[in-house]
Every structure is written in C-alpha cells, then in structure tokens.
C-alpha cells in the first residue's frame, strides 16, 4: 500500500479555508525540495487571526505568525517565494493566491460586474464621440479647402452640388446613336466644333467601320474567333498556306543551303616562360662550331717549337737540394746564439744546447716516465 502523503496527483487535497468547500490537488511539501521538508507552510486560518485591541477599537484583524505581526500581502508574497515551484494542479496559471479566500473574492467579483459594464459602456461612448468629432472636423477642413481652391472646385464641383461652376471637358466618348443630336447641337456651338471636329470625325469613322464589319461577319455566319473570313478558320487556312509555301521553297532551294564549316584547328603555341629567350637553330650551330681563343694548335705543319709561346721547363737536381739542406742545418748547430743576459749578472750561466734536428729515435721508457710524472 502507498503511504498517506505519497499520491501527490489525486489524494493530497489542499483546503484554502474551512468555510469554503473548494478543494484542489497540491503537491506535498516533502516532495518539492528534499533538502527542506517544511518549506510550504499552511495558510493562516480564521482561528489563527487575533484582534488587535489597541487599533480602531479592536475591529481590525492581523496575521500573527511566530510572535510577529505580518500583513496579508506580505504573507502571500513570502508564501509564493518559499513555495519553490507551483504545484501540479496550478500549472495552468491558477495561482494559489486565488484560493485562499474564494468566497469573498467571488462575491466581490459578482458585485463589481455591473459597475465594470457601466464603465466599459461609458468609455466606448466617449471614444465614439471623439471619433465623430474628429471626422466632422476633417470633413469641414476638406470642404473649406475645396471652396478656397479653384482647381478642386472645377474638378469636384458637380459632386458637391455647385451647378453654377464652369463646365469641364470630359474624356468620355459620346454614343453613336446620338450622332444626329450632336450634329444639331454642333450648329449652335460653332466655336467648340472647330477644336474637336477633326478628332471627332476620325473616331466616328473608325467606329462606323467597326460596326459595318461586325454586321458583315454576322451575315457571313459567325463573329469573332468563329467567323469564317476572319477567325480561327482563317488562321488555320493561313497556316496551311504558309506550310505549303515553305515546302515548295525547300524543294526549289535544296542546293542553296548555307553549309557551316568550322575553321581549321591550329596547333597550340609552345610554352615559353617569361624572361627566357629561346635559341634559334643558327645559334645552336654556332655553339657547336665555336673556337675558344685559349685553344692551342700544337700540331703545326712545320713542327717547329718556336711558334709555341711557352716557357721552357727548368730541370732541377734533387741531389743538389739535399746537399744544401744539410749545409744549412750544420751552420745552425754551430752558430747557436748565446742567450741575452741582463747587466746585473756577471757570471754567465751555462746554457744547454738542444738538438734541432730529429734523429729519428723515440723516447726511452725512462724519459716517458719523466714526462708523465
């Protein structure tokens, strides 16, 4: 079985007031926020209201919660803030505030309905009066503008009822049935006839021709597209005639076709990069037969060495070079220079002589030990 406060959709019922019989589902407090189980506090009931004897002779009521007086609006505001989220039954904009005192709120609404209707009707009547006044003022302004402006009077005078205004020329064409009457009236108005005689005659002649052509078409048996002489049938006849003419022209002019010939395709030019001058065939042959000025023709006809401009080679004796090197080394050994001593030394110390020439013999083991140590 499910615990008592677990079915939050149906079983949990919130009663806003003891006197009111309205119930609606409410989510339990411990399911809204698990960390704080006592967030939703029950609303203040009538038995929790206490009278304040110090103000207004004890007639006012105040909310007393935790030993402090709290106003009803502040109580509702804090209650809505602490709620966290709206209950599941209040998701359709049914706030919990409206269910605290439902009877009093409904009664006040029912009592205020006629007053609201009266105020709305008064506002509508005021708006209609303002609109009518604005429209009247605008019509009067337009009327005054027409009277002050001569052009507007000439255009719209007959509409406004001013029949004494000068008549304007109309672009509407007169009927042909009244042609006789127009001719009789034209005898009276000779001045106007001079200006409009040419154009009127042209229009009348064109309309008479059109009427005569319509009468002939009726006699021939058809009007418009279904006429035998000038309609769909005539178009069909003309198209067949044109097709026959084109066939005859093709048969006569079979040899006169303009044959289109494409131009001969040219070979593409070779690719030449920028800054590169290609060698011609003459240049290549010159390079093949080029004679350098440093080239020597040693093979002459006379085979004489006088013509060759070269220095003769000197022959060097290797034995003589060896003798010279030996003499130089001996002189160096004999004429070894004495070391320069300062003037303070009276006794000349014996300076050991060193062999300058390597005798091609390595060091003894004793000498090697001396070097290492």
From Swiss-Prot:
Coiled coil: none annotated. Residues 1-10, 240-256 have a biased composition (Basic and acidic residues). The keyword Magnesium does not apply. It is found in: Cytoplasm; Nucleus. Phosphorylated by CDC28. The phosphorylation may be important for ESP1 localization to the nucleus. Ubiquitinated by the anaphase promoting complex (APC) at the onset of anaphase, conducting to its degradation. Residues 1-27, 177-278 are annotated as: Disordered. Pfam families: Securin. One of its GO terms (molecular function) is enzyme binding. Residues 225-235 have a biased composition (Low complexity). The modification Phosphoserine is found at residues 185-186, 212-213, 277, 292. GO terms for cellular component: cytoplasm; nucleus; separase-securin complex; spindle. Residues 12-26 have a biased composition (Polar residues). Residues 185-194 have a biased composition (Acidic residues). A motif (D-box) lies at residues 85-88. One of its GO terms (biological process) is positive regulation of metaphase/anaphase transition of meiotic cell cycle. Its main location: cytoplasm. InterPro entries: Securin_separation_inhibitor (IPR006940). Keywords: Cell cycle, Cell division, Chromosome partition, Cytoplasm, Mitosis, Nucleus, Phosphoprotein, Ubl conjugation. The N-terminal destruction box (D-box) acts as a recognition signal for degradation via the ubiquitin-proteasome pathway. Belongs to the securin family. Interacts with the caspase-like ESP1, and prevents its protease activity probably by covering its active site. Interacts with CDC20. Regulatory protein, which plays a central role in chromosome stability. Probably acts by blocking the action of key proteins. During the mitosis, it blocks Separase/ESP1 function, preventing the proteolysis of the cohesin complex and the subsequent segregation of the chromosomes. At the onset of anaphase, it is ubiquitinated, conducting to its destruction and to the liberation of ESP1. This is Securin. It comes from Saccharomyces cerevisiae (strain ATCC 204508 / S288c). The lineage of its organism: Eukaryota, Fungi, Dikarya, Ascomycota, Saccharomycotina. The gene is PDS1.
């Amino acid at each position: 079985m499910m615990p008592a406060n677990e079915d939050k959709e149906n079983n949990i019922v919130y009663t806003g007031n003891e006197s009111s019989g309205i119930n609606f589902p409410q989510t339990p407090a411990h399911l809204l926020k698990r960390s704080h189980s006592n967030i939703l506090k029950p609303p203040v009931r009538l038995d929790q209201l206490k009278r304040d004897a110090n103000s207004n002779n004890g007639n006012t009521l105040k909310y007393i919660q935790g030993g402090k007086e709290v106003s009803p609006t502040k109580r509702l505001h804090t209650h809505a803030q602490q709620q966290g989220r709206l209950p599941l039954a209040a998701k359709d904009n049914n706030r919990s505030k409206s269910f605290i005192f439902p009877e009093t709120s409904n009664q006040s609404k029912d009592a205020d309905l006629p007053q609201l209707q009266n105020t709305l009707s008064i506002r509508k009547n005021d708006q209609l009066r303002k609109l009518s006044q604005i429209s009247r003022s605008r019509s009067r302004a337009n009327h005054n503008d027409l009277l002050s402006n001569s052009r507007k009077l000439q255009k719209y005078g007959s509409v406004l009822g001013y029949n004494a205004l000068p008549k304007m020329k109309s672009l509407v064409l007169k009927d042909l049935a009244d042609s006789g009457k127009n001719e009789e009236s034209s005898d009276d108005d000779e001045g106007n006839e001079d200006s409009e005689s040419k154009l009127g005659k042209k229009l009348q002649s064109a309309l008479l021709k059109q009427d005569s052509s319509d009468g002939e078409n009726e006699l021939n048996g058809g009007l418009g597209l279904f006429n035998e002489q000038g309609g769909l049938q005539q178009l069909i006849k003309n198209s067949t005639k044109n097709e026959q003419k084109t066939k005859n022209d093709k048969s006569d002019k079979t040899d006169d076709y303009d044959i289109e010939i494409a131009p001969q395709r040219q070979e593409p030019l070779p690719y030449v990069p920028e800054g590169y001058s290609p060698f011609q065939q003459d240049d290549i042959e010159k390079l093949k037969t080029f004679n350098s000025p440093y080239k020597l023709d040693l093979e002459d006809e006379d085979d004489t060495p006088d013509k060759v401009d070269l220095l003769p080679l000197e022959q060097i004796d290797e034995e003589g070079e060896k003798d010279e090197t030996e003499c130089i080394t001996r002189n160096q050994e004999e004429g070894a220079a004495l070391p320069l001593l300062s003037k303070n030394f009276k006794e000349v110390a014996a300076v050991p002589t060193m062999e300058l020439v390597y005798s091609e013999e390595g060091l003894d083991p004793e000498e090697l030990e001396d070097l290492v140590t």
